[in-house]
Amino acid sequence: MANESNKTVKVRLVRGLRGAQSRHRLSVRALGLNKLNDVRELKDSPQVRGLINTVHYLVKVEE
């Protein structure tokens, strides 16, 4: 169980936000991504996975 809580996900913003829906822009900001090619290492949780699924076409995920 302790190993599961330490899992992280790397998320990279690979497409610009111009033309994206405002809700999707907010989801990208919530992930901590600001500029193109920004990378964040986030804790793997259902909340983070939901945000990633919302903007799957804007980001690239590395396990």
From Swiss-Prot:
Transmembrane spans: none
Cellular compartments per GO CC: cytosolic large ribosomal subunit
Gene3D superfamilies: Ribosomal protein L30, ferredoxin-like fold domain
Entry keyword set: Ribonucleoprotein, Ribosomal protein
BP-aspect Gene Ontology terms: translation
GO molecular function per UniProt: structural constituent of ribosome
Classification via CDD domains: Ribosomal_L30_like
Keyword Cell membrane belongs to the record: no
Family according to the record: Belongs to the universal ribosomal protein uL30 family.
HAMAP family for the chain: Ribosomal_uL30_B
Subunit structure and binding partners: Part of the 50S ribosomal subunit.
Protein name: Large ribosomal subunit protein uL30
Species per Swiss-Prot/TrEMBL record: Stenotrophomonas maltophilia (strain R551-3)
Classification lineage: Bacteria, Pseudomonadati, Pseudomonadota, Gammaproteobacteria, Lysobacterales
Gene name, Swiss-Prot/TrEMBL: rpmD
